[in-house]
Every structure is written in C-alpha cells, then in structure tokens.
Design a protein with these regions (language model features):
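Conserved alpha-helical substructure of the radical SAM core
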Residues: 1-76, 80-81
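A conditional alpha-helix N-cap/helix-loop micro-motif detector
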Residues: 8, 67, 109-112, 139
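A structural micro-motif
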Residues: 25, 59, 83, 126-127, ...
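Hydrophobic/aromatic residues located in beta-strands of well-ordered beta-sheets
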Residues: 27, 61-63, 85, 129-131, ...
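Glycine-enriched alpha-helix->loop->beta-strand junction motifs that scaffold or abut catalytic
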Residues: 79-85, 153-156
Length: 203
C-alpha cells in the first residue's frame, strides 16, 4: 500500500514530539519507491518546514529512488529540498537488468541512466548524492560495476552485498567470501590508480 499523507504527517509529529532538545532532524523517503507517491512527499516536506520555527527544529531530507519515474519536475524538487539523494543502480547494464526487471519484462538501465545524469548535472555542489548498487552471487566481479559507474560520470559510489535467504540462487554465502575479499583488493587498486592520476572518486 502507498503511504497516505495522514500517516506521514503523524510520523513527523511523532518525531518532533519525541526529539527532545535535538535541533536537527533527519527524514528519509525510501522504498517502495518515493516517485510513485511524490505528491505526498512534496506535501510532507512542506508540512515539516511549517513545523520548524514553532518547535525550533531543522529538517534534513534524504530520498532513495530507482529513477524509473523521475521527471524534470521531480528532479528540480529533489535538488531543492533533499539534502542527500541515493540513486539505486547495480552497475553494468546486464547486471542491473538481471535483478531490476520492469513490469513489461525489460530492465531499467536504459531509462534510469539519463535520469540520474540529469539529476546529478543539475544538483547543487553543496548537496550530497551517491549511486548505490547491490552485488550478488551473479556479479562477484563487482569492481567492474564500480568502474562502469565511474566511467559514466558518477564519482560518488557505494556498492554493498545483497542480504538474501541462502536458498535464493543470487544469495551470497560463506563460500563466496574469499572471492569477495579478493575483489575488494582489486577494487582498492583501481580506485588508487584513479586517485594517483589526480582524479576524484569516493567509494
């Protein structure tokens, strides 16, 4: 079910009422997919802003999105209001589209890359963002996914292991750990090479 404005408003009220003397409050909008309910996100941000002065609070927002439904209007709102943005993509096209399948059976890669590039290109330099991927047993060579994202122009990158029931074919098991440790060594060498060339990458 999609969260209603009323439920979100009660959550914000609860946060304010139980935050004591804390001035800075963090609110994260994430999955499901916030862009499916973006009007509610906009209204909740507006409501939270109205509560800042009366309660001596300051809200900071983060949104996590898979990027499929992002419009220019959403991007402008996100870049204005969201302190941090997490852009979900798993790396190379074949890796991303194996796990992120749309209703019509196609993958999301070709749709989200242009959306993410527009968002990042328009994002103010003083606001945070990063692309965030998940690696599975299917792509234990995930250093290649990190480099693929970097080559696309994304220099703020996080890639983390999937959490899944061991019975799932894509689940990571203890037997995979030596391979994963080796891959992190490979990744660290690739990142160091970029930095040695005087370029920026944050992982």
């Amino acid at each position: 079910a999609i969260m209603s404005y009323e439920v979100g408003k009660r959550a914000l009220d609860f946060l304010v009422e139980n935050s004591g003397t804390r001035h800075n409050l963090e609110v994260d909008f994430f999955g499901g997919e916030p862009s499916l309910n973006f009007g509610t996100v906009e209204k909740l941000v507006e409501y939270a802003r109205s509560q800042e002065e009366p309660h001596n609070k300051k809200f900071r927002y983060t949104v996590t999105t898979n990027g499929v439904l992002l419009t220019d209007e959403m991007i402008d709102f996100i870049n204005k209001e969201m302190y941090n943005v997490v852009l979900s993509i798993d790396g190379r096209k074949e890796v991303n589209d194996r796990m992120r399948v749309r209703v019509d059976g196609t993958g999301s890669y070709d749709r989200i890359i242009p959306n993410f590039k527009r968002l990042v290109d328009k994002r103010p330099k003083n606001k945070d963002w990063y692309v965030r991927g998940t690696y599975t047993k299917y792509n234990l060579d995930f250093s290649n996914d990190v480099m693929h994202l970097y080559d696309l122009g994304f220099d703020q990158i996080s890639v983390e292991p999937v959490m899944a029931d061991p019975s799932e074919p894509y689940a990571i098991t203890e037997a995979d750990l030596p391979r994963i440790f080796k891959e992190y060594e490979i990744l660290s060498e690739k990142i160091q090479k970029i930095r040695d060339e005087g370029k920026f990458i944050n992982f």
